[in-house]
């Protein structure tokens, strides 16, 4: 199977990424990422919650970013403002590599998951109320103290994927899965069995003064009908490929059709 490329993913693709098996992304993800991103108001509406975070975290820019204070022997978490129980959702996390430290965990949590611990740990995923991927160690955590945590994505023995600054979190509440995408490639489901819950974007951090950004990419619901016009646009864009979308303006098409193909 060839690599499953997705639109609007991170442009930084590690060379080791090709060593990992790829998976078909959740139904509707390509369409979600091909659409214009939500405006700034909507992104803040789905951003970090200043009222639902550790006391050592300062939420900034209306929810688009948080900064962890330099407190020793503390792990600190934050939840998003919106919880999701239906539909397909995707959001981008930006976390500089030099600001991750020993435990940098990205995932989802219920409203009951703890947001602070008096030691350094993978807080997100430490109990039954949260699920997380440690993007430094490449380990998955759920009800875990870190012992025998599975590697994600599964690859050649001893080979660990270097996670770039930007990664995409993909939560499919229709199928009950949580997965991740980097460099435009979906890495497959990391967790299953999430149906019936309300889950919030979440991270836990240990690095003093780290700044972690969130950018909500949108939502798709299974009951949303897809028009023939919309499906035709997807086919044309897929046939051109990301590298040739700039040539749409040169095609012998009416101006209105060109604008539609470019989501203008």
UniProtKB/Swiss-Prot annotation:
User: Pfam families, from UniProt?
Assistant: SOCS_box, SPRY
Keywords in alphabetical order: Cytoplasm, Ubl conjugation pathway
Cite a single GO BP annotation: intracellular signal transduction
Q: Name one GO molecular function term.
A: ubiquitin-like ligase-substrate adaptor activity
> What result is annotated for mutating residue 206 to A?
Loss of interaction with PARW. No effect on interaction with MET. Loss of interaction with NOS2
This protein's GO CC annotations: cytosol
Show where the SOCS box domain sits. Answer: 222-264
Question: Where are the annotated segments for Disordered?
Answer: 1-34
* Main subcellular location: cytoplasm
Top-rank lineage group of the source organism: Eukaryota
Q: Where in the cell is it found?
A: Cytoplasm; Cytoplasm, Cytosol
Q: Bias category Polar residues: which stretches?
A: 1-19
Q: Which residues form the signal peptide?
A: none
**Pathway where this protein functions:** Protein modification; protein ubiquitination
Comment field on protein domains = The SOCS box domain mediates the interaction with the Elongin BC complex, an adapter module in different E3 ubiquitin ligase complexes. Essential for its ability to link NOS2 and the ECS E3 ubiquitin ligase complex components ELOC and CUL5.
What is this protein's function per UniProt?
A: Substrate recognition component of a SCF-like ECS (Elongin BC-CUL2/5-SOCS-box protein) E3 ubiquitin-protein ligase complex which mediates the ubiquitination and subsequent proteasomal degradation of target proteins. Negatively regulates nitric oxide (NO) production and limits cellular toxicity in activated macrophages by mediating the ubiquitination and proteasomal degradation of NOS2. Acts as a bridge which links NOS2 with the ECS E3 ubiquitin ligase complex components ELOC and CUL5.
What family name appears in the similarity comment?
A: Belongs to the SPSB family.
Relate the assembly described in the record.
Component of the probable ECS(SPSB2) E3 ubiquitin-protein ligase complex which contains CUL5, RNF7/RBX2, Elongin BC complex and SPSB2. Interacts with CUL5, RNF7, ELOB and ELOC. Interacts with MET. Interacts (via B30.2/SPRY domain) with PAWR; this interaction occurs in association with the Elongin BC complex. Interacts with NOS2.
Any idea what this protein is called?
SPRY domain-containing SOCS box protein 2
